[in-house]
């Protein structure tokens, strides 16, 4: 293991001792804010320190076994050879575990997201494919016990969506979906195609973490234009009688968000403001993320919206993710919500990139 990583582990061990003492301090116990903060840090550090202690014990066992290799008794030497082999394997596994635990955590991984799907090139076929993608993510959300709430939708003339925006709420939503941003391409024969020719169309997907109150960008009300209109979305006859839908334009950036799915104008405004904050946050962080990805020549994790990330080929039943050269012949299962088959290899590749950079 690299010396820089061992230094980090020594620092964490010292910090763990400090935290143990602090959590037993009467002054800290009486201050609930400090006590909760230290408790959270303790919970994060404790498993790493415990595993590091195990690593040090196994290193000691290895040194003892290696000393026995010089023993005059051939039986002892034979036993020591086997013990050295097993202990070295243990060390490899423990080091790999510790490296994964030391990877920098994305503070957004546990957040809910705003999922934006827009039809691109391909006209009606692109809109139909937007609908396919939205159903795919909705089914995936069902499998994971997440809740999907449509905020805004613009349906296509022959099905699907020209644009659909949803909020996805649940456990580690952003951590799972963050690499879905980009251009998704579909190749298939449209139902209206009499010659059986394959058409290519595309949609763009954007996954934005929902900011919390501390993370939310401060927005000057003077920079906003707020319009109300009658919703064409869910809610039945009630929404047709009131201007409950909200459209907010952020004048300095030109970003427009709208929410029409709630009956309450107040709720629609709150959702729209949260989405606007997410888009402004994304605007700030995307440039930095792209610069880092470019510098390290990363494909996974760049989040470039214009990057073609995946192709769905219906005649071949094939899904190809171009970032990790992954090809699966299980298109129906993926579209039915089995997106983990694509997501997990992407997360593994990203983790490998992080491990390569760790300790540099």
Swiss-Prot record:
Post-translational modification: Methylated by PrmC. Methylation increases the termination efficiency of RF1.
Pfam family, one: RF-1
SUPFAM superfamilies according to UniProt: Release factor
Keywords: Cytoplasm, Methylation, Protein biosynthesis
Gene3D superfamilies documented for this protein: 3.30.160.20, 3.30.70.1660, 6.10.140.1950
UniProt keyword annotation of Ribosomal protein present: no
This protein's GO CC annotations: cytoplasm
UniProt subcellular location: Cytoplasm
PROSITE patterns xrefs: RF_PROK_I
GO molecular function, one term: translation release factor activity, codon specific
Residues with N5-methylglutamine modification: 237
Entry keyword Protein biosynthesis: yes
Family, similarity comment: Belongs to the prokaryotic/mitochondrial release factor family.
Function: Peptide chain release factor 1 directs the termination of translation in response to the peptide chain termination codons UAG and UAA.
Name under which the protein is recorded: Peptide chain release factor 1
Biological source species: Pseudomonas syringae pv. syringae (strain B728a)
């Amino acid at each position: 293991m690299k010396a820089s990583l061992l230094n980090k582990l020594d620092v964490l061990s010292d910090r763990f001792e400090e935290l143990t003492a602090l959590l037993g301090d009467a002054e800290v116990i009486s201050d609930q804010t400090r006590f909760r903060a230290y408790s959270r840090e303790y919970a994060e550090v404790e498993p790493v320190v415990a595993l590091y202690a195990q690593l040090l014990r196994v290193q000691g066992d290895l040194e003892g076994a290696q000393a026995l290799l010089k023993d005059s008794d051939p039986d002892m030497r034979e036993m020591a050879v086997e013990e050295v082999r097993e202990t070295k394997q243990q060390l490899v596994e423990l080091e790999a575990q510790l490296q994964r635990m030391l990877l920098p955590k994305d503070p957004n991984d546990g957040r809910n997201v705003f999922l934006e799907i827009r039809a691109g090139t391909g006209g009606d076929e692109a809109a139909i494919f937007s609908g396919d993608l939205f159903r795919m993510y909705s089914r995936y959300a069902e499998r994971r016990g997440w809740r999907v709430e449509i905020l805004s939708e613009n349906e296509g003339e022959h099905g699907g969506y020209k644009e659909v925006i949803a909020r996805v709420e649940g456990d580690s939503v952003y951590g799972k979906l963050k690499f879905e941003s980009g251009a998704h391409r579909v190749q298939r024969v449209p139902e209206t195609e009499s010659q059986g020719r394959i058409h290519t169309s595309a949609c763009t997907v954007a996954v934005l973490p929902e900011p919390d109150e501390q993370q939310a960008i401060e927005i000057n009300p003077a920079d906003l234009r707020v319009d109300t209109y009658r919703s064409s979305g869910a809610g039945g006859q009630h929404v047709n009688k009131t201007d409950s839908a909200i459209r907010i334009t952020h004048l300095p950036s030109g970003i427009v968000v709208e929410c029409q799915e709630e009956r309450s104008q107040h709720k629609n405004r709150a959702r729209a403001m949260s989405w606007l904050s997410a888009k402004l946050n994304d605007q700030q962080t995307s440039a930095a993320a792209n610069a880092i990805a470019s510098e390290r020549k990363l494909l996974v994790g760049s989040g470039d919206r214009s990057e073609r990330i995946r192709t769905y080929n219906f005649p071949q039943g094939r899904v190809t993710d171009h970032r990790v050269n992954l090809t699966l012949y299980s298109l129906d299962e993926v579209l039915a919500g089995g997106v983990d088959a694509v997501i997990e290899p992407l997360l593994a590749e990203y983790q490998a990139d992080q491990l390569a950079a760790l300790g540099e």
